């Protein structure tokens, strides 16, 4: 970590804790800043704030009092989940207090080069794939960012010989000014988080900030399957490397079932460790990064063939009596489940789906359900899911929760079948988040394996 004097003796307000705020507070204190942390969670329910106070850092909890900004703060570091129309943020902007993001703070002190990955879908899987391939090739890749390891914490241990492989959300990118990765990946761009950004155009603009400071000596990897990529590519100074599953491009591409990089065959799609058309895209982006980083083809192929997925994201859990289980609890919308289904033989597949009822009809999912062996349906959206199953002429059973659904699926399954949890719905009708929902699937698998 570079020790810089930019923040020494500067009064800095950390707005919002969580993991990133806690890490930023500790980093800035180490750099000699005079830090105040403000978090909305009450102090007696806030172990992170309590720990910071014990370290001598000033904390103010329970609300975000606008009058706090009457103090002469020289910077604000904003939690990425707090929008720019928050009263505290608006007041800071009105007072012309510079607002930093936690990832940019990490960038300022990083000795290690950065590979940044953003996009609407596939960020976590692609980030993990890239780190795995780089490490398999003898490099030292450190996961950081939106993947659960705050960049401002990881950067404190990183040295010049490391590479920070950083997952970046639109929330983290919207406020960056100096941030410059050496390689950036945009997996795809879909209309998501519009409640935060206001419009698809503003959402894309936030994602596009990943390349704002890049030059021709840096590399930007874009999904050539999307028309928007061609438009965006004309506006960057970075060297663009495209990837595509639909056509041959001057980068990474799929052709006749083989993944290539610039005419060099790397791996067959059927040899990838994770199924689904979206994972072919993730693998192509990974191949592009790996080749730019000097990783040998055989190491790339071996690593991608053994990659078992990320927890809750089309994760291959294991087998019981030659019945394979996949945990895709992260699929909280129709598109994600469609992509998951694309990687399987429907005639040998039992799908567990359903969850929070957001008023969606599932007509778009019907073509992907055709030929399914069975569905197990659960949650508030069950009636709508049943209508989709009926239209696809797929038989189904109902379950009260994921555990019961998994047990039912296992009773119905035969040797060679696959059981897939891919709900196409959010979890909040029964579970606090998709992780808890997926953990119940994993726990049930462990019980079934123990009884087998």
Curated annotation (Swiss-Prot):
Keywords: ATP-binding, Cell cycle, Cell division, Cell shape, Cell wall biogenesis/degradation, Cytoplasm, Ligase, Nucleotide-binding, Peptidoglycan synthesis
Transmembrane segments: none
Pfam families named in the record: Mur_ligase_C, Mur_ligase_M, MurD-like_N
Function comment: Cell wall formation. Catalyzes the addition of glutamate to the nucleotide precursor UDP-N-acetylmuramoyl-L-alanine (UMA).
Pathway where it operates: Cell wall biogenesis; peptidoglycan biosynthesis
Catalysed reactions, semicolon-separated: UDP-N-acetyl-alpha-D-muramoyl-L-alanine + D-glutamate + ATP = UDP-N-acetyl-alpha-D-muramoyl-L-alanyl-D-glutamate + ADP + phosphate + H(+)
HAMAP family in UniProt: MurD
GO MF assignments: ATP binding; UDP-N-acetylmuramoylalanine-D-glutamate ligase activity
Organism: Streptococcus pyogenes serotype M6 (strain ATCC BAA-946 / MGAS10394)
Protein's name in the database: UDP-N-acetylmuramoylalanine--D-glutamate ligase
Subcellular compartments: Cytoplasm
